[in-house]
């Protein structure tokens, strides 16, 4: 389903929206990077300057990498890096926005429909980057192949405040949801244990193909 609050939940976790009730507790060491569906970049800004506003270097699985080298990795050749952002296509702007989020070196990465408007090459680069990413990934996506590629756990919101946890990716979720009592209800557990974004572990996916899926994290002791 669409319009059931998946993106709103991501924005609440990221701190862009206040919840109607309750509190969101973020650990002191948590640094959230948010990749949303809207891209708003000053058109006069140079490509490389936009990325350097986040950081000039970022530590990856390959070591410390410069902004220019990361731009090349994300398909922006040196001659394009000094062009104004306004000359980029919509897909290129979204790719640049994604890179800037990654350059900020978050340890919790929120991806809201990350595969929208990304070409196949960029998607492959993102998936490879996530393979070596040491932090937490929380994503909303209708792309079942992407979910199977990166997700280790899915939380399904099944109405009336019921949240069911399924281990595995999208295919595992579809198979297990056909089995009686195959999922673990976590909504009551989350409220009783003080769940927060800081307790998240592993890559978590949210998908709205058949039911509204959203993220909630168990406490670290679970």
Regions found by a protein language model. Name each.
Residues 218-222:
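A short, hydrophobic C-terminal helix/tail in secreted or cell-surface proteins
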Residues 1-213, 217:
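ABC ATP-binding cassette signature C-motif
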């Amino acid at each position: 389903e669409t319009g059931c609050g998946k993106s709103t939940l991501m924005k609440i976790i990221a701190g862009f929206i206040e919840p109607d009730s309750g509190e969101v507790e973020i650990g002191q060491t948590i640094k959230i990077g948010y990749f949303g569906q809207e891209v708003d970049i000053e058109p006069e800004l140079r490509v490389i300057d936009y990325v350097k506003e986040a950081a000039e270097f970022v530590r990856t699985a390959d070591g410390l990498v410069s902004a220019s080298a990361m731009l090349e990795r994300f398909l922006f050749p040196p001659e394009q890096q000094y062009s104004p952002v306004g000359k980029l296509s919509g897909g290129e702007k979204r790719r640049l926005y994604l890179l800037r989020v990654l350059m900020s070196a978050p340890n919790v990465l929120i991806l809201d429909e990350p595969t929208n408007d990304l070409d196949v090459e960029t998607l492959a680069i993102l998936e490879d980057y996530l393979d070596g990413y040491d932090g937490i990934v929380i994503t909303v996506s209708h792309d079942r192949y992407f979910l199977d590629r990166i997700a280790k756990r899915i939380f399904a919101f099944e109405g009336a405040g019921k949240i069911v946890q399924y281990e595995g990716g999208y295919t595992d979720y579809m198979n297990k949801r056909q089995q009686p009592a195959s999922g673990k209800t976590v909504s009551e557990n989350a409220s009783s244990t003080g769940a927060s974004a800081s307790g998240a572990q592993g890559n978590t996916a949210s998908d709205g193909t058949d039911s509204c899926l959203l993220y909630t994290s168990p406490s670290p002791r679970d």
